[in-house]
Structure formats: C-alpha cells, structure tokens
Design a protein with these regions (language model features):
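Helix-centric, low-specificity signal for extended rod-like, repetitive segments
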Residues: 11-12, 30, 74, 157
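Bacterial N-terminal signal peptides that target proteins for export
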Residues: 3-22
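Sec/Tat signal peptide C-region and signal peptidase I cleavage site
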Residues: 19, 32-36
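General helical secondary-structure elements
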Residues: 14-15, 33, 160
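General helical structural elements
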Residues: 22-23, 168
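Hydrophobic core
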Residues: 24-33
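N-terminal small/polar-rich segments of proteins
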Residues: 37-120, 125-173
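Serine/proline-rich low-complexity intrinsically disordered segments, especially terminal tails, linkers
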Residues: 5, 14, 29, 82, ...
Length: 173
C-alpha cells in the first residue's frame, strides 16, 4: 500500500464511498431548514329551499262559441297552451278566476299530469281555487298540455268579448 492508504486506511475503498454519500446526505438534510406545510380550512354552508315554480307557454286562449246543432246546446270550443313545472316538494296545482263567469257560461281547464302525478281532467274554474293536478313530487317537466274549454247554454244569450284572468298556483302539500 502506499503511504496515504497506510496513514488513512478508512478513507479508501468502496465502503468509504458509501459512508461519504451517507454523510453528505445527512448533513444536507440536517443542515437544511425544514419545509413547513401550511393548511387552511373553511366551512361550506349550504341550503336548498322549497322550490315550486309553474310557467305557461303559447298564445293566451281565445274561445269563441259560434255554432250549434238545431235542438242542441251551443257547440263547446277548446284552446290550448303548454305548461312547465318544477318542484322539490310534494305539491298540487290549482287554478282560480279573478271574477265569476257570466250565467250560462262554463270555463274549464285540464292539465296533463307530470310523471307520477294525477290530473283531475277538465275542471270548471271559479273564483275559488280548484285543484287540477295532485300528487306532483320532486320533478321538473316542460311541454305539458293545458287545454281550456268553454261551454254555453242557450240561456247564456249573446255575450260580447270578455276575459278572465286565470291564476295557477303550485302549492306544497
């Protein structure tokens, strides 16, 4: 061996290389500042409130009775629109007129039932809310048929053009 290896026998050879790498890694790790990890938290507050919405589409109905068969009451007439409904509760739809119909005239409304609900067919409208659809439960549907009917007795006589505001209400039950 040469004089260097004789004087410092521990710093030569493969085990020295391993120890040197380990010592270097250790000194870098211990000598380096620790990296701090920072976190933050928050609390998300959420809520879904009751949603009961109804809308109408299409032209407002115009109903004209202008024909009859001899010996029979005047021929009823119909008109239609569509409606859409969204609810996240169990609900029903009712309708009411803003004023009573003239004697001898009956205005009806029939709403197609959304999935799982029940339509009460053609219901005569009055100034008191009349149920048209019941059992509506947590859904949203559009393009549902809404059909109006106007029937008259001969005793109604001639009735000039008039109108009634129909208010549809969706109510949680």
């Amino acid at each position: 061996m040469n004089s260097f290896n004789n004087t410092f026998p521990m710093i030569s050879g493969p085990s020295f290389a391993r120890k040197a790498v380990l010592a270097t890694a250790l000194s870098l790790t211990l000598g380096a500042p620790a990296f701090a990890q920072t976190t933050a938290t928050t609390t998300a507050t959420f809520e879904v409130t009751a949603i009961n919405e109804i809308s109408l589409s299409g032209t407002a109905p115009v109903l004209t009775i202008n024909a009859a068969v001899a010996g029979v009451a005047p021929t009823p007439t119909t008109a239609s629109q569509t409606y859409a409904v969204t609810t996240n509760e169990t609900a029903k739809i009712s309708a009411a007129l803003d004023a009573a119909m003239p004697d001898g005239l009956t205005l009806t409304a029939a709403m197609a039932a959304p999935t799982g609900a029940t339509s009460l067919s053609a219901v005569a409208l009055t100034t008191t809310g009349q149920d048209l659809v019941t059992g509506i439960s947590k859904l949203n549907e559009a393009g549902l048929a809404l059909t109006y009917g106007l029937a008259a007795t001969s005793a109604a006589g001639v009735v000039g053009s008039s109108n009634r505001v129909i208010t549809y209400t969706i109510t949680a039950i």
